[in-house]
Structures are given as structure tokens and as C-alpha cells.
Amino acid sequence: MPSLAPDCPLLAMPEETQEDSVAPMMPSQRSRGPLAPNHVHEVCLHQVESISDLHSGAGTLRPYLTEEARPWDELLGVLPPSLCAQAGCSPVYRRGGFLLLLALLVLTCLVLALLAVYLSVLQSESLRILAHTLRTQEETLLKLRLASLSQLRRLNSSEAQAPS
């Protein structure tokens, strides 16, 4: 279980949070082996009045947000070492690998944007062709109706002239 930092005041949790966080252990959970070590060494809970306090640093968070910016290696150190060992990377290649992944992500986004534009143009072109086809069919149907009415009139007039 992570330890609380010595400079973090222990805050009382609301009843709803306590109910959610305290759950009885199931028998299957007790029989599990030891959990993998967590890379979070300290947990520091700070009371905030609203979500905007987290972004602006206002309110009771002000003393805790004055820490210096963390170096790049410390930020990348959040990844478990076992993950880097499996991938075969060393701390020297972390930043380069991260930048390579970032470049790959940007390139993928550009390709997807181009594909979206291409599909949009293709869709508008096919809709234009479909509209033209429907107009042509509508004109043909109108011509067939006129021809049918003309034939019906001729038939009616020839029956009226025929002697019975």
C-alpha cells in the first residue's frame, strides 16, 4: 500500500467516497499471490473546491503546485522498468523513441485526415452522379407516362369511331 507523504495532511473523505472505497475482500482475492510493486511511491490527497482549481492552481492547491518542473527522464520514468526491459530500450533511447512514436502518431493523423478528405470528395462525387441518374430516370418516366397517355387517348378515340 502506498505511503502518505509526510507533508500531506490527511483529509477526511465524504461518506459516499468511503462507502465506495471500502469493499469487503472476496475469498478469491485473498488467495491471490503478492501484487506487483507499484511505481507510485507517495499518494498526496489535496482538497479542491472545483475542477477549475486543478487547472488554475487556485485555492488550497497553491502551495503544492509551486514545485519545480520535473526533468524529462523523471517524466519518462513513470513507465515500469519491466516494460522497457521487454522492449529492449535503455534510458538513452527513451526520448528518441517517444519522439519517434509522436512523429508516427502525427503522420497517422495526417494520413487519416487526407483519407477523410478523399472519402468526402468521393462521396460528394457519387452523390452528384446519383442525383444525375435520378433526374434522368425521372425524365424518362415522365416521357413514358406521356406516351402511355397518348396511346390511351388514341385507343379510346379509335374505339369510339368503330361501328358497333
UniProtKB/Swiss-Prot annotation:
Entry-linked Pfam families: DUF4714 (PF15833)
Record-annotated membrane-spanning stretches: 97-117
One cellular component term from this protein's GO annotations in UniProt: membrane
Primary location recorded for the protein, binned into one broad class: membrane
Cellular localisation: Membrane
Membrane topology designation: Single-pass membrane protein
Key words of the record: Membrane, Transmembrane, Transmembrane helix
Keyword Cytoplasm in record: no
Name the record gives this protein: Leucine-rich single-pass membrane protein 2
Species this protein is from: Homo sapiens
Phylogenetic classification of the source organism: Eukaryota, Metazoa, Chordata, Craniata, Vertebrata
Gene designation: LSMEM2
